[in-house]
Amino acid sequence: RAARLNDCFVVIGVNERGPKKLGTLYNTNLTISPTGEILGRHRKLVPTWAEKLTWSGGDGSTLTVHDTEIGVLGTLACGENTNPLARFTLMAQGEQVHVANYIGLPTAPSDYNMAEAIKLRGMTHSFEGKIFTIISCSAVSEEIIQEMERFVPNARELLTRESGAFSGVIGPDGNLVGEGLIDDEGIVYAEIDLNRCIQPKQMHDILGHYNRFDIFDLRVNRTVQTPLTFVNEVYSEDSYNQSLKTSRNEDD
């Protein structure tokens, strides 16, 4: 509904439960068109760290891109933007605009700058693929802190660490487009011109002239993982007799 009302594309993270897997959750990104149609979903391939206690990993079938009027869209969730093989899989499908969404992590180790780490991943993907990367990261609000204080007395101390979140847009040269947000909830505005992706590719097009696919061969299993595969079809007596009759007629 929000996509239709605002005539925009939406990429949003959700908790997804499969219709037949009632005890399994996936960390899923949905891509939604301006008409409100779900273009596709991407299930995070590997839950990060403690996420493994709650979410399961997706399969290769959701490593897809979507050809739209604003460019070829692709998305990865949070820490999997560190995975060069997953990122290259999207690049190789012609990705032009990449959406990377993250959680704010104020509880990261003191020597780990989460905001810089998020931005660095986006800069790397944009510079390597000569594409735009849109980064959206949640932030810990005062409302969240107050709610957590009901259960954890020192929640404010734990959740107010600086540089725990970054949102912004990275251009195909690896630089920030416009202004970014650090530790704040808000809206980032930036103008994207896909023509800017062309000139840098004349120098380094890792999908074409600047690669050696006679040497490197990346193979991706896009098979949907299912809990059951029927090897042999089961026939009823009537269907078996019918198949025999058909076979005899063909022999005649």
Residues of each region from the PLM?
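CN hydrolase (nitrilase-like) catalytic-core segments centered on the catalytic cysteine
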Residues: R1-V11, V72, C78-E191
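Short, solvent-exposed loop/turn segments at conserved positions within beta-propeller repeat blades
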Residues: K21-L25, T160-S163
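Active-site-proximal beta-strand elements of phosphoester/diester hydrolases
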Residues: T28, R41-R43, V65, G71-E80, ...
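Short, acidic, Ser/Thr-enriched surface-loop or helix-capping motifs
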Residues: T31-P34, I170-G171
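Active-site glycine-rich loop that binds ribose-phosphate moieties when present
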Residues: T48-T64, N81-L85
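Short acidic-hydrophobic surface loop/beta-edge motif
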Residues: T62-T68, A190
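C-terminal beta-strand edge segments of enzyme domains
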Residues: C137-D252
